[in-house]
Amino acid sequence: MREKRLWNEDWLFCAEALPARAFSVKGPMYKQAKTERVRSGPAARMHNDAVDDYRDGAEYSPERWEAVSLPHDFVIEGVPEARGNNARGFFAYGDGWYRKHFTLPPSDAGRRITLYFEGVATWATVYLNGCLLKRNFCGYTPFEVDITDLVEFGADNVLAVHVETGESEGWWYDGGGIYRNVYLVKTDRVAVDLYGVYVAPQKAGEDLWRVPIEITLRNDGYAACEAEAQVSLVDEEGAIAAVASATGSLPARGKATLLCEAQVRAPRLWDVDAPHLYRAAVSVYVAGELRDQYETRFGFRTFYADPQKGLFLNGKRVKIKGVCAHADFGLSGKAVPDNILRWKIRRIREMGANGYRTSHYPHAEATMDALDEMGFIVMDETRWFESSEDGLEQLRTLVRRDRNRPSVLFWSTSNEEDLHVSPIGRNIHRAMAAEIRKLDDTRLITAAISVRPDRATLGGDLDAIGVNYNFPLWDPIHEKWPQTPVFISECCATGTTRGWYWPDSAEHAYLSAYDRDTNESFLGREKTWKAVMARPWLLGAYQWIAFEHRGEAVWPRLCSQSGAIDLFMQNKDAFYQNQSHWTSAPMVHILPHWNHAGREGETIAVWVYTNCEEVELWLNGRSLGKRQIERFGHGEWQVAYAPGELTAVGYAGGMERVRETVRTSGPAAALKLVAEDTRATANGQDIAVFTCLAVDAEGREVPDASATVTFFASPLGRIVGAGSDISQHKRLSDPVVRMRAGRAAVAIRLGREHGTLRVMARADGWQSAQCALEI
């Protein structure tokens, strides 16, 4: 029977190139030209993890190898420097080695044993007991390594992974290491293949759905056999909605695909507001004996894109209110545990988003699961725009992995390629699209085009045209390809700094928090969303970007400023601006804060983001006037600053619906710690996040406070990241933080011990804060 075990514990890591000895005589060269080709160095089975036993007898100190758990990013452990590459986050990149000792019981002999790597950045070479098994050249594509023939049962085995980060895969922070989960998988020699079940529901009548099912089985035995696959379609309550079965012949050391079909009446549909999911549970039998059990999730939904009327999901018109996102996390780098990946998706759902673009590569499986569960419309993007065999295999892996996900409506072959306007680009896209259709012909195939999208050679080959920015070309593109749906695959990229309400600062590389246009192609959030909603033929838009991310930066700033949520997971004003565009529950948000000592009497621009029809602004009990708010617009007042209370009241239908007040605080007197809802558990991987606020003597937040804050954590966890100021240059795990704009955050990686996690924050002259979290 199938066993899948998370394999993230008990790894050793060394941040060194550690080359093997270059032999110059026949004997050792003869040996290393055999299957066990590596007889020296860290890939060798007998290499001492603490002693360098192959370089002229010299010894390494034991500290060079450290015990680590996955996910792990060794690049983030450095300190950013101005001489570093600004696109890659100003960090020094290098090579690293991982080793893991393990023993499998003799009872596993006869089974198929594989390792499943969700992601290794960037190039990975995998060895078992000195034998080369796999080279992988994409840090974002998962891969499987079959160790069946080489593993020794009942004995110590050594897995070694060499990671090279010199080859950048993008213009953002790549990180380095085994930064996603690894699994040890054991199956019978007859079992479902990797991503081997494909479920493609089709509506056949008013309430009737046909459910074609493909089951790809593999036979790693040395004799052909007959196999039967029995499938149960199971709803969220565990009730069986339908069953089906198929039989077929499996060749020795080969694969076969079995086909069957079920029928389901009146299933609960997957939708952006009610994302119901089903399971396909597959049992595999040979000669009546159960050999494997495998499950995959799927959903029932219909969609079509009308080039004149927009996107329809389950017969209802829906606009994509989307965001793009990179896969890193400001408080841990590229190594992001599953609970944080899910938390990030919950945060953008709170913002009102219903769409997610996996820019510009496959995202982690926990992210994709959360998108299914929370009802997002996903544009699923591969990393490399290549029709080479390696490029196509990466694409096939993405499609096989995600083709059962109801959230995925688009396959994206590429992003911002110069070749999009070349015949070569069309050739590559058509080859990639053909591969996609072999595996899944139920989604729209697209590309995100920024280089003269009105002249794209592949425009007529796309199921839907994705346009990045280029606002003046939206209408001409629609006119040129009137039979092809169009959507905005990337827009805005408006840089703002949390809590910075002054002109842009070259010294700190801070940007004003007020929304604005960059130029006529790069519109701000307000103008972009107005333009999207004014065009019913647009399917919607994916905004750049949900979260600030490392890289694409200007020193001394360490990150891009386009996010609606800052690098350390604090909401920016843009978060609430998006809420005003994308949500219906009445809301108002005032900017700026109301702490402006020394500016008494000066005129300050006060903006209010709201989804209400009218807003009235009050200062210290005096009305400053009521404004009618243009849909997707904002209210704006020029206010002479006076300390006190500034209140915005939102009205709809002539009735007050919501209000918000910002107050002038006193000087900061204390710190306050708040545990974020990351739903962390004591599993050795999860991260708990705490926000630290500066408050005055009355407990009011001080939004302009600054101080040096030091964090402490109990033995139940260790600090992996702390930050506030995007222009502070320190090791991320350093617990000493320069608080900016009254807030900082700390991330604690939990161990396996249950109990009370205690976190403390201290700043000279202020009352300390403590927070306890049961884990």
Each model region followed by its residue ranges:
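Edge beta-strands of extracellular beta-sandwich domains
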Residues: 293-298, 655-666, 767-775
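Active-site-adjacent substrate/metal-binding segments within catalytic domains
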Residues: 52-57, 64, 69-104, 108-137, ...
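Beta-strand-rich structural segments
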Residues: 213-217, 283, 604-609, 649, ...
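Extended acidic/polar, glycine-enriched regions
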Residues: 152-154, 216-306, 634-636, 640-644, ...
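Accessory beta-strand-rich segments of carbohydrate-active enzymes
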Residues: 5, 12-18, 73, 77, ...
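Substrate-binding clefts and catalytic carboxylate motifs of secreted carbohydrate-active enzymes
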Residues: 3-24, 45-59, 75, 168, ...
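Short, hydrophobic beta-strand segments
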Residues: 147-149, 260-269, 637-641, 733-752
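Short flexible loop/turn segments that cap and initiate beta-strands
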Residues: 225-230, 272-279, 611, 618-622, ...
